[in-house]
Amino acid sequence: MPRSRSRYIPSLDGLRAFAVLAVILYHLNANWAPGGLLGVTVFFVLSGYLITGLLIEEWKSTKTIDLKNFWLRRARRLVPAIVFLLLCILVLTTLFNHELLTKMRPDIIPSLFFYSNWHYIFSNLSYFDALGAPSPLTHFWSLAIEEQFYLVWPLILLALFKARTTKKAFCRIIIVLAAISALAMALLFDPAADPSRVYYGTDTRAFSLLIGAWLAFVWPSTQFAQQSAKLPRKTFFALNGCGIGAGIGLICLVAFTNGFSPFLYRGGILLASLCTAVMIAVAVHPQSLLSKGFAARPLVWVGKRSYGLYLWHYPLLLLMNPRNYTGETSPLMYLAQFAIIVACAAFSYRFIENPVRHGAIGKFIKAVRAGSIALPIYLRQHSVPVFAATLLTVIAIGGLIFVPPTAAIGGLDELKANSNTQATPPPPPPEVTNAYDILLIGDSVSVRTIPYFEETFPGGAIDSAINRQLVAGTQIYNHYKDAGVVGTIVVFALGTNGPVTDEDLDELLNTVGADKSIYLVNTRCPDSWEEANNATIARATQRHGNVTLIDWFSLSANHDEYFDGDGTHLTEEAAQIYTAMIQQATAEDMKVVLDNKAKAEAARQEAYSVADQAAQEKEQAAA
């Protein structure tokens, strides 16, 4: 097959470095990169651009697309590093963390066969709120989307090429498909619900890949292969102005958005995709500043290993940062962890990815086919890696077969069973004719406190649910208000599952009104929004005179034993402590409520007594 005219572009490796570093910062919960998850969007646009460019050049050269060869190349590029990673993580979790092993078991097959995103969707597994420790393979959702694109897109291109589709028609088709995908994301997104469905979906993420594909048609990198002449001044400034502006826009999106921002799903990811496309268009031009800046050796070095960095960073971070750790991790410790991630990715690149890419598997197959002499020689020459691979495989298989599921994970079934999973809360029981003494509306953190809360506050009510957002609190409260059962004390234990804004919190508090005693329980969760949410809750207590803070964050500090493996949900001991904390915080208001109830009951009994005495006197007079 004639070789394509595709060229290596170092600056695109630099852009890969930006993308993978953004993702790592996001998973490190860096407060200044809450939108680091957009690094995946950068990868999508890059993949769409490069893969489509290769397929276009192959069609131009051969008037066909060798699908088998294309898919084999993709498999050679992706699968060996994945298999090596899986073996290593299985070994590490078998030896050191059985909870993570339990979590990753059901994800291994979906990850190997690139359908993990749909596995998470149909299993209702959230990307943003993992009950228990997250699976070390959660991040494979993006690889699944890319591989699904690699499977389908060449077929579509080949069919359109054979139908003699013009370049203009190609571009129109791609734009329509991308628009449908972006519209699906906007329409399916529900601000009050977990956004994982639109975050994981191939249908709702395809537009990023398609924008890259569109760019490959209108701005192919091959057209700049021979360009060395200096650009006119105006063209130079226009080109670089666009690239720098797009870069600033992308950085702002990383810095000021997060996984729960409605803007992100209603145009933000689309905007990030367009910014990435502009940056690619500028970076592939050899005379641009981005081309030179992103071609810096450190960035290129990181970019070449970005695939390995992406594979390794998430499981290693989970292993090195237990989510139930409530202490502070020093910057030096984070640097050490980053160095370990880089070392693993570099090892994978040097000894797994590159050798396979350069025919190591083919050489091994040739050795086997050569017979009994060549194979022993081959194995003897590679005795250390063969022994290591065998040992890893034995330990990994042993862990899968013999390590039982952890009890911590099993306890989560109880959370789901106790959680209110209905869209609206159930109606109050028929015997409730007066207001509840206290009403608590919470998320999954307070689910385990339900039996203790009901025992502590027999005249109260608790409504807690998994994946509940703060913005849903208004609807839940109004339901109880309309039922006429809201007393004077209302507790909100929300803010675990996503960012909380001053506006949303004020709307909730204003809905309740100034005539209630409101308590806000702050949060402890190993997520990027923890610090900001707690600050937002603290500010609300200063703006509203009837609002009091219940400081769970401080009470739980340095008490790793309070939490299940996810560092968020409570153990049985902690559920009792959590309930006692609420009891202590609300004691004065509860005393007033109970005193008033006692007085009302005494008055009622006195009224009954007076009425009864009057009836008796009336009967005696009649006699």
Regions found by a protein language model. Give the residues of each.
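Periplasmic/luminal catalytic loop of GT-C fold multi-pass membrane glycosyltransferases
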Residues: 488-491, 501-515
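Extracellular/periplasmic envelope-modification machinery, especially enzymes
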Residues: 231, 257, 324-331, 342, ...
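Acidic-histidine catalytic/liganding microenvironments
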Residues: 296, 515, 543-544
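Structural recognition of the beta-strand scaffold that forms the well-ordered cores
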Residues: 44, 69, 113, 439-441, ...
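Active-site segments of SGNH/GDSL-like serine hydrolases
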Residues: 508-535
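Hydrophobic membrane-embedded alpha-helices
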Residues: 2-12, 18-405
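Surface-exposed alpha-helical segments enriched in charged/polar residues
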Residues: 300, 510, 538-539
